[in-house]
Amino acid sequence: AYSTCSQLGYMFFALGVGAYPAAIFHLMTHAFFKALLFLGAGSVIHGMDDEQDMRMMGGLFSKMKVTAVLMWIGSLALAGVPIFAGFYSKDIILESAFAAHTGLGLYAFWAGIAAALMTAFYSWRLLFLTFHGRTRADDHTFDHAHDPPPVMIAPLLVLALGAIFSGFLAKEYFVGHQMDEFWGSSILMLHNIIEDAHHAPAWVIALPLVVAVTGILGAFVMYILKPGWPAVFVARIRPLHTFVYNKWFFDELYDRICVRPSFVLGRGFWKSGDGAVIDG
């Protein structure tokens, strides 16, 4: 999932500035809220008779309240909203990147801020298109939409607890006052990057929350208040939209560079080896 790739990006630039505990901390918290979102998506698909296109959903909060609340929890953690797990782990990564005081560290910091804005926007785009606004589903599918049975909801509830509390409960051990005792000799720290991160300027600490709220409000305007705006916006940047919508044409490029040559090579070996030598 591309969202997971972006969160792995946070972990890797934490490693790049030497904030190894912060990277592992985010790996742990991310496991809870991303698994919650994955299973929440499966819950929606199950309740919508295998429909997977958000453009064919909407208004499902009235039909799937438990799933909706759980996915809100996962999204709040992913966006780094205070008290949720992602707030503690993602923010210490951004603060560590800033505290590195290197060119690459500052580049990572601002790239992480941009990613935080986009993360909040696309997360609430998902929530608004799926659970809020008017429904775009056909009458039969919408009327029969439902939360899954308890046996499917139970794992989501466990993950939701982790998405809410794991960051707060673990922060002192992973990146706080008990960090040295917790890690022991497991991680070699060459400098005090985590300690420096805790003394980052106030604007550095506040900025991730500001951009997260901005992304949420942007999605609210675009998909609830002014649902016609996305189409107008897309029409104005059609070439860029086509490029991004097709994932930078990465699949097509991969097919041409890797898949097709592999098939050609395989056929060649089959004809010259198996066909000509073994069977011939």
Which positions does each model-derived feature cover?
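Interfacial segments of multi-pass membrane proteins
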Residues: 12-15, 91-109
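Aromatic-capped, Gly/Pro-kinked transmembrane alpha-helices
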Residues: 172-210, 221-280
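Divalent metal-coordination and catalytic microenvironments
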Residues: 5, 30, 57, 86, ...
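Predominantly late transmembrane helices and immediately cytosolic-facing juxtamembrane segments
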Residues: 34, 38, 106-144, 180, ...
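Interfacial and helix-entry/exit segments of alpha-helical transmembrane bundles
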Residues: 1-6, 48-84, 106-115, 140-165, ...
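Alpha-helical transmembrane segments of polytopic integral membrane proteins
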Residues: 38-41, 50, 81, 90-91, ...
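Alpha-helical multi-pass transmembrane bundles of energy-transducing inner-membrane proteins
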Residues: 1-54
